[in-house]
């Protein structure tokens, strides 16, 4: 942790020469207490606050630039700041993560920087009190909701699936199933049974799963009607927001009761709450078998939302990220069942390898686009909740500027590698370093806003 703090202090000292790379103080209690730089007089006024969750390593540094150079010069918004950097999570016994989630419940919109989920090596590196849980998991457990991942499409970035000309958004039901299962190894012959004992005192129900003639493995897993219903509401509301059709995939032909329950709950909620709205937007909802859906996705041009059970969503979201070209061009939004509360972030991690180079004083070429889109998706949603068309227009303009900047040929090394191959790319010929790329986006944004 000491090394982490030294780097941040050195960055703060460097800011005196006009550098845009000084991150916020690691334990700043509230962003509003931090000094403001020279912002425009005619910034877009935002009536209600946005929760800001700061993060770790290279993304933390980029996050500060985005906020100070791309967002706040144009948007007058009160940011409820929470430092989710690993040192502060450890210092507060992870209470800061809980507080940030509760603030999101209160204010309905949060933007989050990528954070470290510590393993044993990180516990040693930061001298942590304990191995703290994933902040994303903690936030999801408090807010509920569904994580939707959506690619950012740039025409000049090759796709492994060339036919995907429109985005495909995956909604993963991040609750239960294999991820909360009880699994075990059987070392001898015997009978595997599952028993359900009702709380009302009525007799238990028992199912025989398998008679093992010898060793093997077994598993028991579950989900709840409440969680499946929340998942369904989030998916239907997200599809309406995007004005895209929604597909839900299961294997209900095999898991007739388990996956059949997902299918039945989705259909009932659709008929009761959303069919009229879907018809109005000329979009539709369909259930598909997972194997049929995978085949259809590969053949499609995109432009839909795909609701997946937990394991399917885990696997298919990574396939989509690679199929569209880069995890650095993937957004992630947690949408709660109330249809009002969201938390937006980049789909990638803290870019540790680049941060190690940055600590040594070496320039990096780190892709900031997904982090920028975390801000824009959060601000756009704030604008929709508040009826603030200027804020919506700003968020959409910044997203358009990012895409057009890449399509004009200015990009970071990861994207240049998608086009030319990583071994063939050269700095300033095929790609820019991090600061130059961000400065290019800033110049293009200022120009685009000046033309409105």
UniProtKB/Swiss-Prot annotation:
Pfam family, one: Iso_dh
Cofactor details (free text): Binds 1 Mg(2+) or Mn(2+) ion per subunit.
Keywords from the UniProt entry: Acetylation, Glyoxylate bypass, Magnesium, Manganese, Metal-binding, Mitochondrion, NADP, Oxidoreductase, Transit peptide, Tricarboxylic acid cycle
One GO cellular component term: peroxisome
InterPro entries: IsoCit/isopropylmalate_DH_CS, Isocitrate_DH_NADP, IsoPropMal-DH-like_dom
Example of a GO biological process term: glyoxylate cycle
Needed co-factor(s): Mg(2+); Mn(2+)
Record-listed NADP(+) binding positions: 115-117, 122, 299, 349-354, 367
EC number: 1.1.1.42
UniProt PTM comment: Acetylation at Lys-413 dramatically reduces catalytic activity. Deacetylated by SIRT3.
N6-acetyllysine PTM positions: 45, 48, 67, 69, 80, 106, 155, 166, 180, 193, 199, 256, 263, 272, 275, 280, 282, 384, 400, 413, 442
Keyword match Acetylation: yes
Transit peptide (residue range): 1-39
Family: Belongs to the isocitrate and isopropylmalate dehydrogenases family.
Name of this protein: Isocitrate dehydrogenase [NADP], mitochondrial
Origin species: Bos taurus
Gene: IDH2
């Amino acid at each position: 942790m000491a090394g982490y703090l030294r780097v941040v202090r050195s960055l703060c000292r460097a800011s005196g020469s006009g550098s845009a790379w000084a991150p916020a103080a690691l334990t700043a209690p509230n962003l509003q207490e931090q000094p403001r730089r020279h912002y425009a007089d005619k910034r877009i006024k935002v009536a209600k606050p946005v929760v800001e969750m700061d993060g770790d390593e290279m993304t933390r540094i980029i996050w500060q630039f985005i906020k100070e150079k791309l967002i706040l010069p144009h948007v007058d918004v009160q940011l409820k700041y929470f430092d989710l950097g690993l040192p502060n999570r450890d210092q507060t016994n992870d209470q800061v993560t809980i507080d940030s989630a509760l603030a999101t419940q209160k204010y309905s919109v949060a933007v989050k920087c990528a954070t470290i989920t510590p393993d044993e090596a990180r516990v040693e590196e930061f001298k942590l009190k304990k191995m703290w849980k994933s902040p994303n998991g903690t936030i999801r457990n408090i807010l509920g909701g569904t994580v939707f991942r959506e690619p950012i499409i740039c025409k000049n970035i090759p796709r492994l699936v060339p036919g995907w000309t429109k985005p495909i958004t995956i909604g993963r039901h991040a609750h239960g199933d294999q991820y909360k299962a009880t699994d075990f190894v059987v070392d001898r012959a015997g009978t595997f049974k599952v028993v359900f004992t009702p709380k009302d005192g009525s007799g238990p129900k028992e199912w025989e799963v398998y008679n093992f003639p010898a060793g093997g493995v077994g598993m028991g897993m579950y989900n709840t009607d409440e969680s499946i219903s929340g998942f369904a509401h989030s998916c239907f509301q997200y599809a309406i927001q995007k004005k895209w059709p929604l597909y839900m995939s299961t294997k209900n032909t095999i898991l007739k009761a388990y996956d059949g329950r997902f299918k039945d709950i989705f259909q009932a909620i659709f008929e009761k709450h959303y069919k009229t709205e879907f018809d109005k937007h000329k979009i539709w909802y369909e259930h598909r078998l997972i194997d049929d859906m995978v085949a259809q996705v590969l053949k499609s041009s995109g432009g839909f939302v795909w609701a997946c059970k937990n394991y399917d969503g885990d696997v298919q979201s990574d396939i989509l990220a690679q199929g569209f070209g880069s995890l650095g061009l993937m957004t992630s939004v947690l949408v709660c069942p109330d249809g009002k509360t969201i938390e937006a972030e980049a789909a990638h991690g803290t870019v540790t390898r680049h941060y190690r180079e940055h600590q040594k004083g070496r320039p990096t070429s780190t892709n900031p686009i997904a982090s920028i889109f975390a801000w824009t998706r959060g601000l756009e949603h704030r604008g929709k909740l508040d009826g603030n068309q200027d804020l919506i227009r700003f968020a959409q303009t910044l997203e358009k500027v990012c895409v057009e900047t890449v399509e004009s040929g200015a990009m970071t090394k990861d994207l240049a590698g998608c086009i030319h191959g990583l071994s063939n790319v050269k700095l300033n010929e095929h790609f820019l370093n991090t600061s130059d790329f961000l400065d290019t986006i800033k110049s293009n944004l200022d120009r685009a806003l000046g033309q409105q």
